[in-house]
Amino acid sequence: MPYVTVKMLEGRTEEQKKALAEKVTAAVSETTGAPEENIVVFIEEMSKNHYAVGGKRLSDK
């Protein structure tokens, strides 16, 4: 049973997250042969306060 975790900044719509889960599931099924009903997708959203690049939080830009 494949498990996929997608980490991304918050702010996507529910429709975007639904489409992401559907397309990731389809891609994993196609490439691994796993049935779609056995594929688990976790979407973890992060606040810009909790994400930094080059030592700078995205919320500080």
Swiss-Prot record:
Q: Where would one find the signal peptide in this protein?
A: none
Q: GO MF annotations for this entry?
A: isomerase activity
Q: What is its EC number?
A: 5.3.2.-
Query: Matching Gene3D superfamilies, A to Z?
Result: Macrophage Migration Inhibitory Factor
Is-annotated flag, keyword Lipid metabolism? no
InterPro entries, per database record: 4-OT, 4-OT-like_dom, Tautomerase/MIF_sf
Record has Amino-acid biosynthesis as a keyword: no
One Pfam family this chain carries? Tautomerase
List, from the UniProt record, the residues annotated as the active site of this protein.
P2
- Write down the CDD domains for this protein, in alphabetical order: 4Oxalocrotonate_Tautomerase
The entry sums up its family as follows: Belongs to the 4-oxalocrotonate tautomerase family.
Name by which UniProt lists this protein: Probable tautomerase BC_5378
What organism does the record attribute this protein to? Bacillus cereus (strain ATCC 14579 / DSM 31 / CCUG 7414 / JCM 2152 / NBRC 15305 / NCIMB 9373 / NCTC 2599 / NRRL B-3711)
